[in-house]
Protein backbone atom coordinates (compact mmCIF):
# COMPACT_ATOMS: atom_id res chain seq x y z
CA UNK A 1 0.00 0.00 0.00
CA UNK A 2 1.62 3.24 -1.17
CA UNK A 3 -0.12 5.28 1.51
CA UNK A 4 1.16 3.00 4.26
CA UNK A 5 4.69 3.22 2.85
CA UNK A 6 4.41 7.01 2.74
CA UNK A 7 3.14 7.11 6.32
CA UNK A 8 5.99 4.84 7.42
CA UNK A 9 8.52 7.18 5.78
CA UNK A 10 7.01 10.13 7.64
CA UNK A 11 7.38 8.28 10.94
CA UNK A 12 11.02 7.46 10.21
CA UNK A 13 11.70 11.09 9.31
CA UNK A 14 10.01 12.25 12.50
CA UNK A 15 12.02 9.83 14.63
CA UNK A 16 15.30 10.98 13.12
CA UNK A 17 14.36 14.56 13.95
CA UNK A 18 13.73 13.80 17.63
CA UNK A 19 17.32 13.53 18.79
CA UNK A 20 16.29 13.03 22.41
CA UNK A 21 14.57 9.78 21.40
CA UNK A 22 17.44 8.19 19.52
CA UNK A 23 19.49 6.79 22.44
CA UNK A 24 16.41 4.84 23.57
CA UNK A 25 14.57 3.91 20.38
CA UNK A 26 17.87 3.13 18.68
CA UNK A 27 17.92 -0.07 20.74
CA UNK A 28 14.68 -1.10 19.04
CA UNK A 29 11.08 0.08 19.16
CA UNK A 30 7.79 -0.85 17.52
CA UNK A 31 5.93 1.87 15.65
CA UNK A 32 2.67 1.75 13.75
CA UNK A 33 0.53 3.70 11.31
CA UNK A 34 -3.21 3.53 10.65
CA UNK A 35 -4.90 4.94 7.56
CA UNK A 36 -8.30 6.35 8.46
CA UNK A 37 -11.34 7.86 6.81
CA UNK A 38 -13.18 10.80 8.36
CA UNK A 39 -16.58 9.60 7.21
CA UNK A 40 -18.18 10.05 10.61
CA UNK A 41 -16.90 13.57 11.10
CA UNK A 42 -13.76 14.29 13.07
CA UNK A 43 -13.72 16.16 16.41
CA UNK A 44 -11.48 19.22 16.26
CA UNK A 45 -9.17 17.97 19.01
CA UNK A 46 -8.20 15.01 16.80
CA UNK A 47 -6.73 17.28 14.13
CA UNK A 48 -3.20 17.55 15.62
CA UNK A 49 -2.86 13.77 15.52
CA UNK A 50 -4.06 13.31 11.93
CA UNK A 51 -1.24 13.37 9.41
CA UNK A 52 -1.91 14.28 5.80
CA UNK A 53 -0.05 11.89 3.52
CA UNK A 54 -1.22 13.25 0.20
CA UNK A 55 -4.83 12.26 -0.25
CA UNK A 56 -5.19 10.19 2.90
CA UNK A 57 -5.06 10.67 6.65
CA UNK A 58 -2.99 8.60 9.06
CA UNK A 59 -2.49 8.15 12.78
CA UNK A 60 0.93 7.31 14.24
CA UNK A 61 1.72 5.33 17.38
CA UNK A 62 4.58 3.71 19.28
CA UNK A 63 4.43 0.83 21.74
CA UNK A 64 4.85 1.28 25.48
CA UNK A 65 6.64 4.46 26.50
CA UNK A 66 9.46 6.59 25.16
CA UNK A 67 11.61 8.29 27.78
CA UNK A 68 9.01 7.28 30.35
CA UNK A 69 6.17 9.05 28.56
CA UNK A 70 3.02 7.48 27.13
CA UNK A 71 2.27 10.48 24.92
CA UNK A 72 4.34 12.64 22.58
CA UNK A 73 2.90 15.24 20.23
CA UNK A 74 1.92 13.71 16.90
CA UNK A 75 1.36 10.18 18.23
CA UNK A 76 -1.83 8.73 19.66
CA UNK A 77 -1.72 8.52 23.46
CA UNK A 78 -1.87 5.35 25.51
CA UNK A 79 -5.35 3.88 25.89
CA UNK A 80 -5.00 4.46 29.62
CA UNK A 81 -2.21 6.62 31.03
CA UNK A 82 -1.28 5.00 34.32
CA UNK A 83 2.06 6.77 34.75
CA UNK A 84 0.96 9.96 36.55
CA UNK A 85 3.61 10.54 39.26
CA UNK A 86 1.08 10.71 42.12
CA UNK A 87 -1.48 8.37 40.58
CA UNK A 88 -2.80 5.07 41.89
CA UNK A 89 -0.45 2.93 39.81
CA UNK A 90 2.73 4.77 40.75
CA UNK A 91 1.86 4.78 44.45
CA UNK A 92 1.25 1.04 44.52
CA UNK A 93 4.20 0.35 42.25
CA UNK A 94 6.38 2.19 44.78
CA UNK A 95 5.22 -0.20 47.50
CA UNK A 96 6.12 -3.18 45.33
CA UNK A 97 9.50 -1.63 44.60
CA UNK A 98 10.06 -1.20 48.34
CA UNK A 99 9.24 -4.89 48.86
CA UNK A 100 11.80 -5.78 46.19
CA UNK A 101 14.38 -3.69 48.03
CA UNK A 102 13.59 -5.30 51.38
CA UNK A 103 13.72 -8.82 49.94
CA UNK A 104 17.06 -8.13 48.27
CA UNK A 105 18.45 -6.56 51.46
CA UNK A 106 17.42 -9.56 53.57
CA UNK A 107 18.93 -11.96 51.05
CA UNK A 108 22.26 -10.15 51.33
CA UNK A 109 22.08 -9.36 55.04
CA UNK A 110 24.75 -10.26 57.58
CA UNK A 111 22.03 -11.86 59.73
CA UNK A 112 21.28 -14.43 57.04
CA UNK A 113 24.95 -14.98 56.24
CA UNK A 114 25.72 -15.46 59.96
CA UNK A 115 22.80 -17.88 60.40
CA UNK A 116 23.98 -19.93 57.43
CA UNK A 117 27.53 -20.04 58.78
CA UNK A 118 26.19 -21.18 62.16
CA UNK A 119 24.21 -23.92 60.42
CA UNK A 120 27.25 -25.16 58.50
CA UNK A 121 29.33 -25.17 61.68
CA UNK A 122 26.60 -27.02 63.60
CA UNK A 123 26.42 -29.69 60.92
CA UNK A 124 30.19 -30.10 60.81
CA UNK A 125 30.47 -30.25 64.61
CA UNK A 126 27.64 -32.75 64.85
CA UNK A 127 29.26 -34.95 62.25
CA UNK A 128 32.64 -34.82 63.99
CA UNK A 129 31.18 -35.68 67.42
CA UNK A 130 29.23 -38.65 66.09
CA UNK A 131 32.19 -39.99 64.12
CA UNK A 132 34.56 -39.48 67.05
CA UNK A 133 32.34 -41.52 69.38
CA UNK A 134 31.85 -44.18 66.74
CA UNK A 135 35.63 -44.49 66.48
CA UNK A 136 35.85 -44.78 70.26
CA UNK A 137 33.23 -47.58 70.25
CA UNK A 138 35.17 -49.39 67.56
CA UNK A 139 38.36 -49.23 69.66
CA UNK A 140 36.52 -50.56 72.73
CA UNK A 141 34.61 -53.29 70.94
CA UNK A 142 37.07 -56.10 71.63
CA UNK A 143 37.46 -55.47 75.39
CA UNK A 144 34.17 -53.97 76.52
CA UNK A 145 31.63 -55.78 78.67
CA UNK A 146 27.99 -56.22 77.70
CA UNK A 147 27.01 -53.44 80.08
CA UNK A 148 29.66 -51.12 78.59
CA UNK A 149 28.44 -51.93 75.08
CA UNK A 150 24.87 -51.10 76.06
CA UNK A 151 25.97 -47.82 77.63
CA UNK A 152 28.09 -46.88 74.61
CA UNK A 153 25.24 -47.58 72.17
CA UNK A 154 22.89 -45.53 74.32
CA UNK A 155 25.46 -42.73 74.54
CA UNK A 156 25.84 -42.75 70.75
CA UNK A 157 22.09 -42.27 70.42
CA UNK A 158 22.23 -39.39 72.92
CA UNK A 159 25.11 -37.76 71.00
CA UNK A 160 23.15 -38.08 67.75
CA UNK A 161 20.08 -36.59 69.43
CA UNK A 162 22.03 -33.61 70.82
CA UNK A 163 23.67 -33.12 67.43
CA UNK A 164 20.30 -33.19 65.69
CA UNK A 165 18.91 -30.67 68.17
CA UNK A 166 21.89 -28.38 67.64
CA UNK A 167 21.52 -28.56 63.86
CA UNK A 168 17.76 -28.05 64.13
CA UNK A 169 18.25 -24.92 66.26
CA UNK A 170 20.68 -23.49 63.72
CA UNK A 171 18.35 -24.44 60.87
CA UNK A 172 15.49 -22.68 62.64
CA UNK A 173 17.48 -19.42 62.64
CA UNK A 174 17.95 -19.68 58.88
CA UNK A 175 14.34 -20.72 58.33
CA UNK A 176 13.05 -17.75 60.34
CA UNK A 177 14.81 -15.28 58.07
CA UNK A 178 13.84 -17.19 54.92
CA UNK A 179 10.23 -17.29 56.15
CA UNK A 180 10.27 -13.50 56.49
CA UNK A 181 11.56 -13.24 52.93
CA UNK A 182 8.87 -15.64 51.70
CA UNK A 183 6.25 -13.58 53.49
CA UNK A 184 7.47 -10.48 51.68
CA UNK A 185 7.49 -12.37 48.37
CA UNK A 186 3.91 -13.49 48.97
CA UNK A 187 2.89 -9.92 49.76
CA UNK A 188 4.70 -8.70 46.64
CA UNK A 189 2.94 -11.28 44.47
CA UNK A 190 -0.48 -10.37 45.88
CA UNK A 191 0.15 -6.66 45.44
CA UNK A 192 1.45 -7.20 41.90
CA UNK A 193 -1.56 -9.33 40.96
CA UNK A 194 -3.96 -6.80 42.46
CA UNK A 195 -2.26 -3.91 40.67
CA UNK A 196 -2.31 -5.79 37.38
CA UNK A 197 -6.00 -6.57 37.82
CA UNK A 198 -6.70 -2.91 38.65
CA UNK A 199 -4.86 -1.87 35.51
CA UNK A 200 -6.87 -4.31 33.41
CA UNK A 201 -10.15 -2.94 34.79
CA UNK A 202 -9.09 0.67 34.12
CA UNK A 203 -7.86 -0.09 30.61
CA UNK A 204 -11.01 0.17 28.48
CA UNK A 205 -11.07 -0.85 24.82
CA UNK A 206 -13.53 0.78 22.42
CA UNK A 207 -15.15 -1.24 19.65
CA UNK A 208 -16.09 0.10 16.18
CA UNK A 209 -19.66 0.50 17.48
CA UNK A 210 -18.44 2.78 20.28
CA UNK A 211 -18.87 0.28 23.12
CA UNK A 212 -16.09 0.64 25.70
CA UNK A 213 -15.28 -2.34 27.93
CA UNK A 214 -12.42 -3.19 30.32
CA UNK A 215 -9.95 -5.50 28.66
CA UNK A 216 -10.42 -7.90 31.58
CA UNK A 217 -14.04 -8.35 30.47
CA UNK A 218 -13.00 -8.74 26.84
CA UNK A 219 -10.67 -11.62 27.70
CA UNK A 220 -13.24 -13.20 30.03
CA UNK A 221 -15.84 -13.19 27.24
CA UNK A 222 -13.36 -14.70 24.82
CA UNK A 223 -12.51 -17.45 27.32
CA UNK A 224 -16.20 -18.27 27.81
CA UNK A 225 -16.86 -18.44 24.07
CA UNK A 226 -13.81 -20.49 23.14
CA UNK A 227 -13.04 -22.48 26.28
CA UNK A 228 -9.64 -20.81 26.46
CA UNK A 229 -7.74 -21.02 29.74
CA UNK A 230 -6.36 -17.50 29.18
CA UNK A 231 -8.66 -15.73 31.63
CA UNK A 232 -6.24 -12.89 32.40
CA UNK A 233 -4.81 -10.70 29.65
CA UNK A 234 -1.02 -10.98 29.27
CA UNK A 235 0.96 -8.20 30.89
CA UNK A 236 1.24 -5.23 28.56
CA UNK A 237 -1.95 -6.03 26.64
CA UNK A 238 -3.12 -2.87 24.90
CA UNK A 239 0.29 -1.18 25.02
CA UNK A 240 1.19 -2.16 21.44
CA UNK A 241 0.66 0.09 18.44
CA UNK A 242 -2.32 -1.67 16.84
CA UNK A 243 -4.61 -1.55 19.92
CA UNK A 244 -3.72 2.10 20.51
CA UNK A 245 -4.40 3.08 16.92
CA UNK A 246 -7.66 1.16 16.58
CA UNK A 247 -8.94 2.29 19.97
CA UNK A 248 -8.20 5.93 19.15
CA UNK A 249 -9.93 5.63 15.78
CA UNK A 250 -12.97 3.92 17.28
CA UNK A 251 -13.18 6.48 20.07
CA UNK A 252 -13.03 9.47 17.70
CA UNK A 253 -15.33 8.33 14.87
CA UNK A 254 -12.51 7.58 12.46
CA UNK A 255 -12.94 4.58 10.16
CA UNK A 256 -9.84 2.35 9.96
CA UNK A 257 -8.76 1.49 6.42
CA UNK A 258 -5.31 -0.13 6.66
CA UNK A 259 -2.73 -0.67 9.37
CA UNK A 260 0.97 -1.50 9.53
CA UNK A 261 3.45 -2.05 12.36
CA UNK A 262 7.20 -1.88 11.87
CA UNK A 263 10.40 -2.00 13.87
CA UNK A 264 12.83 0.86 14.24
CA UNK A 265 16.39 0.45 15.51
CA UNK A 266 18.45 -2.58 16.45
CA UNK A 267 16.94 -5.96 15.61
CA UNK A 268 15.49 -7.87 18.56
CA UNK A 269 17.49 -10.91 19.59
Describe the function of each predicted region.
Residues 1-269:
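Catalytic cores of nucleic-acid editing and processing enzymes
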